[in-house]
Amino acid sequence: MKQYHDLIKTVLEHGVKKEDRTGTGTISMFGYQMRYNLQEGFPLLTTKKLHTRSIFHELLWFLKGETNIKYLHDNKVTIWDEWADENGNLGPVYGKQWRSWETADGRTIDQITNVVEQIKKNPNSRRMLVVAFNPGDVDKMALPPCHAFFQFYVANGKLSCQLYQRSADIFLGVPFNIASYALLTHMIAQVCDLEVGDFVHTLGDAHLYLNHLEQANLQLTREFRPLPQLKLNPAKKDLFDFTYEDIEIIGYDPHPAIKAEVAV
């Protein structure tokens, strides 16, 4: 995907060296935006193989409202292991905020259900947002949300999504985030009887870790291949009824995976 390669090139050329929380060090820039037309194919990187099982199960786990890694482990997904405590708990991370945000007066808000209902009943609304970054809960989270909030937009029968990501690990995290939110947009579009439009990805601190530079430069040498297609089970009309078996990627022919260490 040219948009993603352009991001890597821009940060390598114009980024600044910065220290970071993990002690690894980064090349970073502030403020960057990419746009993917979801009609043109599913935005899954072809210049390195991505582990789609992890991407899809993580999204389903968020949608379940869960914050313990048991579901992930049951499905052979280990991407959250470094942050979980000895009981597998992560604190009030994405699933909690998406499905049961706690208000000051003791109520809980199911943001995902609310936004789907808004899309169906009031598609011209400018309030179709879901927020994961809850300042009142940040100190209780194993890792505060990197993908902080997202907004939907309906025009000409198409559903678009824009994500604001406060912290963007370009080599390891961003490819997962692109695919995850593209999948979510497809799923919500289906249950709302809409086509898909664009996925707009807005990054705050966009960074390449210093121990990912060799891998990023290797990836830039690889030729793009055609994007795959996403096929969802058309019988599913409720967002929370989707399972892993309802998601199929067709025609994914990527270059080999490129290993890199995650910064914790």
UniProtKB/Swiss-Prot annotation:
Catalytic activity, as annotated: dUMP + (6R)-5,10-methylene-5,6,7,8-tetrahydrofolate = 7,8-dihydrofolate + dTMP
Gene3D superfamilies in the cross-refs: Thymidylate synthase/dCMP hydroxymethylase domain
An example Gene Ontology biological process: dTMP biosynthetic process
Binding site for (6R)-5,10-methylene-5,6,7,8-tetrahydrofolate: H51, D169, A263
Keyword Iron-sulfur in annotation: no
UniProt-annotated binding residues for dUMP: R21, R126, R127, R166, S167, A168, D169, N177, H207, L208, Y209
Family indicated by similarity: Belongs to the thymidylate synthase family. Bacterial-type ThyA subfamily.
Role played: Catalyzes the reductive methylation of 2'-deoxyuridine-5'-monophosphate (dUMP) to 2'-deoxythymidine-5'-monophosphate (dTMP) while utilizing 5,10-methylenetetrahydrofolate (mTHF) as the methyl donor and reductant in the reaction, yielding dihydrofolate (DHF) as a by-product. This enzymatic reaction provides an intracellular de novo source of dTMP, an essential precursor for DNA biosynthesis.
HAMAP family: Thymidy_synth_bact (MF_00008)
Name this protein carries in UniProt: Thymidylate synthase
Organism: Bdellovibrio bacteriovorus (strain ATCC 15356 / DSM 50701 / NCIMB 9529 / HD100)
